[in-house]
Amino acid sequence: MNMIRITDAGVQPFETEHIGLVRKTAPECALFLKREDETLPVAAGKVALYGSGARKTIKGGTGSGDVNVRHYVTIEEGMENAGFEITSKAWMDAYDNVVAEAHKTFVERVKKEAAELGINAVMYGMGKAMPEPEYELPLDAEGDLAVYV
């Protein structure tokens, strides 16, 4: 195996080659759902998109199951690229704010607990997971379709 040192932040030739291979082989890996009454595929239109996975789409595993990439397409971005109009952007923005505030509070709490115990905050925080925040946001977007991810 040849290892190379990348000193240029630009897209490398091997990355372009790999992206091409993924685009070529991805259709062979698609999962098709049971189709009844011509319900799938859904025609592009207005969609109310909700859920943490809409913008924070999970693209792989964790640890060795994760893949470092420059960019990956989120559910929101993919639906927009397919011609859908996302009508719930205000909800997603509000949800992002709720999560950001919850994360800030979580980090402050972990740092405080570590200080009280006399433990390094980084070490104390390892393995701790922020719980999903509780929130009440109106589900008031309109559309031809609603999707929760």
Residue ranges and their predicted role:
Residues 1-149:
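C-terminal non-catalytic regions of proteins with extracellular/luminal or membrane-system context
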